[in-house]
C-alpha cells in the first residue's frame, strides 16, 4: 500500500474518506491532512472501535479504491 498517494492528494481523497466514514467532520479531515495514524485515531474515536479494527477498515477501503 502506498499511503503517500493518499497523503499527497488529500484534497481530492478526503471526499471519498467522508463518504466512507460520515461521522468524520470537515474539521477532522482538515486536521488529519492525509496522515494515516491520525485518520486511524479519529475513526477509532468517532466510531468507538479498536485501533486495529480502524486500521483494517482503512486497508479494506484503500484496496477498494483501485489505486
Swiss-Prot record:
Keywords: Plasmid
Highest taxon of the lineage: Bacteria
Pfam families assigned to the protein according to its UniProt record, in alphabetical order: CsbD (PF05532)
Record-linked InterPro entries: CsbD, UPF0337_stress_rsp, YjbJ, YjbJ_sf
The keyword Transferase appears for this protein: no
Name of the protein in question: UPF0337 protein msl9551
Entries under Gene3D superfamilies matching the protein: YjbJ
Similarity comment: Belongs to the UPF0337 (CsbD) family.
Residues annotated as signal peptide: none
PANTHER family tied to this protein: UPF0337 PROTEIN YJBJ
Transmembrane segment boundaries: none
Native organism: Mesorhizobium japonicum (strain LMG 29417 / CECT 9101 / MAFF 303099)
